[in-house]
């Protein structure tokens, strides 16, 4: 998490939304400095310790199409991004999350690298219930959301919201290797597309993302929305109190 007392803003780092690059840029050129820990939540981590005047600061964060995140996850494991998967280490923060993420990384490495899973095999195995991130907790109440798909234009708009002029575009950092196509092209078969509609449909609708028009022959099943609501009850409890 990044805070600037000079410009009165807080940047909440949602994972896999270019948050590292944005945070680095805010620290370099917009008087930001680190507070709490990287992926701290605004409502449960920041507000508990914030001073009254800090609670009035503008709040910005990021967002990214989860279909893109899924493809990126696959290639990060396949290329052993930053040796994160061949030599997994515990995260520094989180009550349960650090153990869950280490288990997840080990499992994906064995399946993708050692067993040679394709993207579709990985997607079918690893994604079984409708997707959500902890953006569902508080992003709707934030002052501006920077979309990964429109990164530099949205970053410029976010800076306007907090009242500062843009110095430059965000330098590319932490880029995933080996991706050679638009992310939705990796969902090649109708089987993968149906799975994607079930897994991502409710989240995409919530955040005004669209599936490709060429997928219109496949509908998001009604029970996906029911499962999304049910699973999110447990997710919110985990993210707020157990992670």
Label every model-predicted segment.
Residues 1-243:
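Membrane-interface amphipathic segments in extracytoplasmic regions
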């Amino acid at each position: 998490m990044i805070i600037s007392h000079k410009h009165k803003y807080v940047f909440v780092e949602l994972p896999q939304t270019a948050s590292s690059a944005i945070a680095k840029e805010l620290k370099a050129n917009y008087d930001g400095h680190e507070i709490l820990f990287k992926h701290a939540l605004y409502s449960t981590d920041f507000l508990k310790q914030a001073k009254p005047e800090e609670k009035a600061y503008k709040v910005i964060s990021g967002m990214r199409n989860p279909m893109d995140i899924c493809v990126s996850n696959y290639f990060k494991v396949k290329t052993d991004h930053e040796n994160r998967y061949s030599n997994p280490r515990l995260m520094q923060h989180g009550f349960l999350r650090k153990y869950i993420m280490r288990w997840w990384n080990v499992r994906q490495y064995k399946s993708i690298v050692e067993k040679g899973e394709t993207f579709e095999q990985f997607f079918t195995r690893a994604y079984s219930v409708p997707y959500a991130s902890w953006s569902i907790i508080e992003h709707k109440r934030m002052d501006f959301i920077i979309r990964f798909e429109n990164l530099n234009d949205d970053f410029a708009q976010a800076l306007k919201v907090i009242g500062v002029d843009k110095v430059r575009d965000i330098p590319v950092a932490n880029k995933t290797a080996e991706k050679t196509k638009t992310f939705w092209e990796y969902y090649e078969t109708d089987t993968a597309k149906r799975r994607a509609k079930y897994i991502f449909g409710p989240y995409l609708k919530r955040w005004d993302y669209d599936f490709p028009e060429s997928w219109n022959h496949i509908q998001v099943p009604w029970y996906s929305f029911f499962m999304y609501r049910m699973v999110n009850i447990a997710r919110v409890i985990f993210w707020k109190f157990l992670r």
